[in-house]
Amino acid sequence: MSDSDSENKQTTTTATSVTQRLLLSLKEAAKIIGTKGTKIQKVRDDNNVKIGISERKERCSDRILICTGSIEDVSNAIGDICEILLSEDVVTNDEDSNEKENDEYNSIEDEKFVYPFLNFRLAKPTLDEVNDAETLKKIINIRVLVTRAQCSAIIGTKGDRIKSLIENRGVRMIASNQTLPDSDERLLEIQGTSMAITKVLEDINAVISNEVRATREKRYVPHVRRRNQPVSTNTSSNTGSSKSFDEEFKSIVKIPEAYVGAIVGRQGNRIANLRKYSKTKIVIEKRASEVSDDAERIFEIISNDIKNVELAESMLKKNLETEIQRRKEMEETESA
């Protein structure tokens, strides 16, 4: 990136005003507000942003956090919100919530909701995947509300932009295909550390600011659905299953070029068996005409069931680890 590009990006992140909207559960909202509003006020003061949470509606299980300011300030504020949600302290005497105070505030991420849009689709990674217990504790999921136009800009042509954001910032992301009830907004779920989420939000908001014009798309407002209105087209929303017939879940695994052949197997048999067992589609990036063994190829896993995607991802990584260990042992044997 040139000096002028860096200066332009810095100017954009500091000068352009943006508004970020997050979907929250009641418990998340109460935890962010804090005792007598002290926590959300600190976020407001520390980051020089306008931030608030929508009123709690009777018989509604969700609320909206709205944050406005410069791209940098808003992104940092959302990072602070992530830190609040990760904290283990319990909300007490919250004047904005009638919920009974208890330790359930400490297990927000494990809660299952009747309202399907509140249920996270990205499962928390395992210790084997992260390889660091402290980092694992710092990983969190958030639900960002985006319009159709914004979502298209974030995904990019053939998904190139969202892939780049995932790779460059070390996060996982899923954009839902369906809109929230009575609106034109969709959910962009982001998983990562607070710092990684802050950085990717800077990138996302810069894209939206530079490429998406103001539209009249209808924003989502928490409300009680009409009696005959379906909750969701996701047939598994009340069963705890992750399967959705109108959503597509994706994940990317990078495999060093030197190991691609072993992972794919002779005549593609090994990867074919993995596809069949995990019930996923696995798209392998084409090999460049000239590439070194330390280069990486992208294996993109696709399914309408997030559990299948996670299974395939885990199996791919395990196969890679096994092959690396096998070659290491062969080298030690030969050198002995």
From Swiss-Prot:
GO BP: chromatin organization; mRNA transport; regulation of translation
Entries under InterPro entries matching the protein: KH_dom, KH_dom_type_1, KH_dom_type_1_sf
KH domain sequence ranges: 17-81, 139-204, 248-316
Pfam short name (any one): KH_1
Record's GO cellular component terms: chromosome, telomeric region; nucleus; P-body
Keyword field: Chromatin regulator, Chromosome, Cytoplasm, mRNA transport, Nucleus, Repeat, RNA-binding, Telomere, Translation regulation, Transport
UniProt xrefs under SMART domains: KH
Annotated localization: Cytoplasm; Cytoplasm, P-body; Nucleus; Chromosome, Telomere
Major location category of this protein: cytoplasm
MF terms in GO: RNA binding
Superkingdom, taxonomy of origin: Eukaryota
Subunit field text: Binds RNA.
Role played: RNA-binding protein involved in the correct localization of transcripts in the cell. RNA localization is a widespread mechanism for achieving localized protein synthesis. Involved in structural and functional organization of telomeric chromatin and regulates silencing at the HMR locus.
Similarity remark: Belongs to the HEK2 family.
Stated name of the protein: Heterogeneous nuclear rnp K-like protein 2
